[in-house]
């Protein structure tokens, strides 16, 4: 109450921010008259002037007002569109490492031109990131004339480009592209073997459109580049046949309750658990199928792989539904994005889940994958020097943006007041009654000529609704993952009088629904439209537009509440753009997933108190509040999962940064001769110490073992015993020095034989190839460690601390193995000439081409093993924003406490 009083007196933090931005808007508006008088050439010359002033030491902040005034004036001349004051405010928010919440239809695409131009003046590149290829191409082409007028180049980064085209896209001043492509390019660059193979410049400024979709919805999903592993498709098929024999029970076994079923499903945690009875039944079925030895246990160490197959098959059958989580297209299982309803071709679930779903659907089972490189969007975007984003719905997730990314959210006011009517939810007892009410509402709207957009949460639901509409002979368009090629076209005309559009979730986001239909798309459909054609189409549209406004604007119908309030707000936000009229209502039933899993008891009790009967709907603020509380619970749980994932991935991220930094230094170095000499001395000294312990008596020495090891691993035939027999005064220190010197002489002889340039190139190739192989094995080891780490909680240990400790030990082992393997290869391999190095490089490229790389998203829940347990066991540690380059004198990111140059920076 006291806080509300202070807010009324001083205004909210958002109000105070807008007040500050308003002062800069006044400055920009004051420049407008002066800039209108400039010729085109004088306006274009402003870009060179700004760049020169930056070089002399002025900051972007000092240039902002003039740069924004320049873009506004250029936009008036090129597009005949003038940036509103609220768009200038949005541009300022985006330039200051913040998130701008701007409502649908407020011109986010045009707003983005302001900070994109300003930050491109530095010459370091600007990345404008969208959710799909269509929007990236559309926005780039739409804004290209404006940027080119101002002397800025524009690139588009989408999948399928050649290396040269990608390089050109990244070298442009402003690059549009998708989040996936930018992330994968980063991983590919860090797998390159030559500096020329890299495409990205250092990551400077990212401006993310639909930032909530990318930084929140996709945050649990790591990007993975993987190669094919061993083929086990037959095993997936055989295990798949056993699952239909298992029976589900309603709840998990406890001390008080032991059920009759074989497994139970925890819908909240999206997990499936086998009962003891189920384990015995599965073991019996596996024995009968010849997959498990008589009397053997599924849980013995030798059968871990088989247990993995059983778990994957059980999850595929119980948790993943066709036309909800995936569709089958062209004999392939294609994942459906739960947040947008779009299909994601080329993406695959990890840990054998995708293969289990393929076996369930009877399509061709593709090989399992082995991770070659991976990163989460959370960690990729934190690598940028500057980060900003815009969306129509960010305020509900403001805490997460601040906590994870250090980004404040500013709600930018609309240009015209919002007049959409958001009506309370209607709740029915059954789904059948709910759909009857939805059909009745649609009929009512059609009679009045009011367009309707119906939002569903799955393809299955949209197809059910489509069948019901067909039964009632109501013409409509369906927009879901199966037909998204027609997406923009359908969305463009969804505002016509009486139009009914059924959209899965928020497919079609990014395209405005214009009341009366989109007249521009009608003009584009004509080959050579004349002035008369354009005037006629505009006049027809004016009549249609006014009729739709008269009917009440676009009516939004939600068939179910989403887990997140933000997704519901996105659906509502399609109506009421730029002061247009509109309305929205959600229809719910007690059989909906959210109600059934999270809100059923409380709402059911309310319904009983209110005396509800079949066919009746309840419309009460209590119910709406109860549903929103249920959504808050789910949002908080999902935030916890994302936070836990980030804390675990931060451990891998620190190691990733060390490895990638070393890799890039090795690749950019002219020669790594000094590095090889340093690690050679370490390795040989370490090997000697195993057989001749430091400061030990001669009786403890294992000289034959040392001679044998040096010969087998390093190709060094040294008469160590002979030296000791002949020289009584040969001490341990002197012996060490002699062995190291002899190795160096042998290596120098090899250098003289093949030539210095050839050997230097060979050293680099061996170092990079060995590092890549060991890093790949290390990622697999980290995956295995993470999957079982939550069990440490039962031993009263903190899983997070244990993970940090063990992953650090694994990393240390990897670096020691790297040193040893590199020296062993360089010592033993006989390089005759340049052709040998070329042959090695050719073999590497052939191997690279043979490994069919998959670009995939690991399935979210599997990434943290059992997130619900993990969230309870792990302590909540604040996440620190990172991504800075590690200096040689900085503390090493691995957590050892040493300086980087004395720890993991040693290699470079």
UniProtKB/Swiss-Prot annotation:
GO cellular component, one term: plasma membrane
Entry's cofactor comment: May bind 1 zinc ion per subunit.
Function recorded in the entry: Part of the Sec protein translocase complex. Interacts with the SecYEG preprotein conducting channel. Has a central role in coupling the hydrolysis of ATP to the transfer of proteins into and across the cell membrane, serving both as a receptor for the preprotein-SecB complex and as an ATP-driven molecular motor driving the stepwise translocation of polypeptide chains across the membrane.
Keyword ATP-binding: yes
Family: Belongs to the SecA family.
Extent of Basic residues compositional bias: 898-908
Source organism of this protein record: Shewanella amazonensis (strain ATCC BAA-1098 / SB2B)
The EC number(s) this enzyme carries: 7.4.2.8
Gene3D superfamilies: Helical scaffold and wing domains of SecA, P-loop containing nucleotide triphosphate hydrolases, SecA, preprotein cross-linking domain
Pfam families with a match to the protein in the record: P-loop_SecA (PF21090), SEC-C (PF02810), SecA_DEAD (PF07517), SecA_PP_bind (PF01043), SecA_SW (PF07516)
Chain residues that bind Zn(2+): 892, 894, 903-904
Keyword Membrane: yes
HAMAP family for the chain: SecA (MF_01382)
Coarse class of the protein's main subcellular location: membrane
Compartments reported by the entry: Cell inner membrane; Cytoplasm
Transmembrane segments annotated in the record for this chain: none
UniProt: ATP binding residues: 87, 105-109, 512
GO biological process terms on file: intracellular protein transmembrane transport; protein import; protein targeting; protein transport by the Sec complex
Topology class, membrane: Peripheral membrane protein
Region (Disordered): 882-908
Protein's recorded name: Protein translocase subunit SecA
Recorded GO MF terms: ATP binding; metal ion binding; protein-exporting ATPase activity
Alphabetic keyword roster: ATP-binding, Cell inner membrane, Cell membrane, Cytoplasm, Membrane, Metal-binding, Nucleotide-binding, Protein transport, Translocase, Translocation, Transport, Zinc
């Amino acid at each position: 109450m006291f806080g509300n009083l202070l807010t009324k007196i001083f205004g909210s933090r958002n109000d105070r921010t807008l007040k500050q931005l308003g002062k800069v808007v006044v400055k920009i508006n004051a420049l407008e008259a002066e800039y209108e008088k400039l010729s085109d050439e004088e306006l274009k010359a402003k870009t060179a002037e700004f760049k020169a002033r930056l070089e002399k030491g002025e900051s972007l902040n000092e240039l902002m007002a003039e740069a924004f005034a320049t873009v506004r004036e250029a936009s008036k001349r090129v597009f005949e569109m003038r940036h509103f004051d609220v768009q200038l405010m949005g541009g300022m928010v985006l330039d200051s490492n913040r998130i701008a919440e701007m409502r649908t239809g407020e011109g986010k695409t045009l707003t983005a031109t302001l900070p994109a131009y300003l930050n491109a003046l530095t010459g370091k590149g600007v990345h404008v990131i969208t959710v799909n290829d269509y929007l990236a191409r559309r926005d780039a082409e739409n804004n290209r004339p404006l940027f080119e007028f101002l002397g800025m180049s524009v690139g588009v980064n989408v999948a399928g480009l050649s290396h040269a085209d990608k390089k050109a896209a990244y070298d442009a001043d402003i690059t549009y592209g998708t989040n996936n492509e930018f992330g994968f390019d980063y991983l590919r660059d860090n797998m390159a073997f030559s500096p020329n193979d890299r495409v990205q410049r250092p990551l400077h400024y990212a401006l993310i459109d639909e930032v909530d979709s990318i930084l929140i919805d996709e945050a649990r999903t790591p990007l993975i580049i993987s190669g094919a592993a061993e083929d086990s498709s037959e095993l997936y098929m055989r295990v798949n046949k056993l699952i239909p024999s298992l029976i589900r029970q309603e709840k998990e076994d406890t001390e008080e309750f032991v059920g009759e079923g074989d497994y139970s499903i925890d819908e909240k945690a999206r997990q499936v658990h086998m009962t003891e009875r189920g384990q015995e039944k599965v073991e019996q079925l596996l024995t009968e199928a010849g997959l498990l030895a008589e009397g053997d246990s599924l849980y013995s160490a030798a059968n871990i792989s088989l247990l993995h197959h059983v778990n994957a098959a059980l999850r595929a059958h119980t948790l993943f539904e066709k036309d909800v989580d995936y569709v089958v297209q062209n004999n392939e299982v294609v994942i459906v994005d739960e947040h947008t309803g779009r299909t994601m071709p080329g993406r695959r679930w990890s840990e054998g889940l995708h293969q289990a779903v393929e076996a369930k659907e009877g399509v061709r089972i593709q090989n399992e994958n082995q991770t070659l490189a991976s990163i989460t969007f959370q960690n990729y975007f934190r690598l940028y020097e500057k980060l900003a984003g815009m969306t129509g719905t960010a305020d509900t997730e403001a805490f997460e943006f601040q906590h994870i990314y250090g980004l404040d959210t500013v709600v930018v006011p609309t240009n015209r007041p919002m007049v959409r009517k958001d009506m309370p939810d209607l709740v029915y007892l059954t789904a059948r009654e709910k759909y009857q009410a939805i059909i009745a509402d649609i009929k009512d709207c059609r009679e009045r000529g009011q367009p309707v957009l119906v939002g569903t949460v799955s393809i299955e639901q949209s197809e059910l609704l489509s069948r019901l509409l067909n039964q009632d002979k109501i013409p409509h368009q369906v927009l879901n993952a199966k037909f998204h090629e027609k997406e923009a076209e359908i969305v463009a005309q969804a505002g016509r009088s009486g139009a009914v559009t059924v959209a899965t979730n928020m497919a079609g986001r990014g395209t405005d629904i214009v009341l009366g239909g989109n007249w521009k798309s009608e003009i584009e459909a004509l080959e050579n439209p004349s002035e008369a054609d354009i005037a006629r189409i505009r006049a027809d549209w004016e009549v249609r537009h006014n009729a739709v406004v008269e009917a009440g604007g676009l009516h939004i119908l939600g068939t179910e509440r989403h887990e997140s309030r933000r997704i519901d707000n996105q659906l509502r936000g399609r109506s009421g753009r730029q002061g247009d009229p509109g309305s929205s209502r959600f229809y719910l039933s007690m059989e909906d997933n959210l109600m059934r899993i999270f809100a059923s008891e409380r709402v059911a009790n309310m319904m009983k108190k209110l005396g509800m009967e079949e066919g009746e709907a309840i419309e009460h603020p209590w119910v709406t509040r109860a549903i929103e509380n249920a959504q808050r619970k789910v949002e908080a749980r999902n935030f916890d999962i994302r936070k836990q994932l980030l804390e675990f991935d931060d451990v891998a991220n620190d190691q990733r940064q060390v490895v990638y930094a070393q890799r890039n230094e090795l690749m950019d170095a002219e020669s790594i001769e000094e590095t090889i000499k340093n690690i050679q001395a370490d390795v040989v000294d370490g090997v000697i110490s195993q057989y001749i312990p430091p400061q030990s008596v001669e009786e403890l020495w294992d000289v034959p073992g040392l001679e044998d090891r040096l010969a087998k691993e390093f190709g060094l035939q040294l008469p160590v015993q002979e030296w000791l027999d002949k020289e009584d005064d040969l001490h341990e220190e002197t012996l060490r020095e002699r062995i190291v010197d002899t190795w160096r002489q042998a290596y120098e002889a090899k250098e003289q034989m093949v030539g210095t340039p050839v050997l230097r190139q060979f050293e680099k190739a061996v170092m990079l190839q060995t590092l890549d192989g060991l890093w790949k094995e290390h990622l697999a080891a980290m995956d295995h460690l993470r999957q079982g780490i939550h069990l440490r909680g039962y031993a009263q240990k903190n899983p997070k601390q244990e993970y940090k400790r063990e992953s650090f030990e694994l990393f240390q082992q990897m670096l020691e193995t790297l040193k040893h393997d590199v020296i062993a290869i360089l010592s033993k391999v006989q390089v005759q000439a340049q052709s040998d190095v070329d042959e090695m490089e050719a073999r590497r490229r052939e191997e690279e081409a043979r490994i069919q790389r998959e670009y995939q998203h690991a399935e979210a829940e599997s990434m943290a093993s059992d997130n619900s347990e993990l969230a309870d066991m792990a302590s909540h540690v604040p996440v620190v924003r990172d991504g800075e380059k590690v200096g040689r004198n900085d503390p090493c990111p691995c957590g050892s406490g040493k300086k980087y140059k004395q720890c993991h920076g040693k290699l470079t």
